[in-house]
């Protein structure tokens, strides 16, 4: 089974994540998404991208199953490779509309916020749950989330790790269109087509102006996020956060 289903709808490239039910990501999945964005950038006939997912969740976060790096240095290098692929998505030149169903949790929320626009439903759940894991936000969220909803509301979501349902997400500005679960993808496609109907040169020029310096700022902040995640990953609190999440209970954190 492929990790992505790629198709075309007129001038829209459809990038469907295909790791159901929860579409956890890793470096390889991000590489494939970035490659698809590169294809769009090189093809003048593609004017926008629709990023969606097959399954219950849009993306419920990073994949922690399977063999993990054994040493702190290896874990840091592994995270560096992952973020390098994520940065490639931010560098894409064509607009991305994300159809966000189910959960967009942790790094999965970061993937959703890498898009230019998000379409969600009342049942969609966003959560930057990093502090609930004894961890630090990643995937450039310390840039993208405050940019969307302001620094105070972003701090509230980061420091509490609270879950935000679709209607509140719409009020906050986390999503741009609120649709029913049944019409979510169709509404996202409608927006992607609307963008594709505009002048490609005008869209490219305007988007570049609006995003001036954004990728460079995300790259700088990713380095900070990686530094913080690297030392926090070695703490007892992080181990407790992972256990508590797996056991569906509150963490008993000891600040060590």
What are these regions (language model features)?
Residues 1-54, 87, 91:
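Conserved CoA-thioester-binding segment of acyl-CoA-metabolizing enzymes
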Residues 5, 31-32, 52-88, 104, ...:
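Glycine- (often His-adjacent) and acidic-residue-rich active-site loop
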Residues 15, 33, 51, 63, ...:
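Terminal peptide-recognition signature
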Residues 22-23, 57, 135, 177:
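Short strand->helix junction
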Residues 30, 72-79, 181, 185, ...:
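Short, structured helix-loop boundary elements
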Residues 88-203, 226-230, 234-235, 239-243, ...:
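Crotonase-fold acyl-CoA enzyme core
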Residues 207-216:
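Short, charged, surface-exposed hinge/linker loops at domain edges
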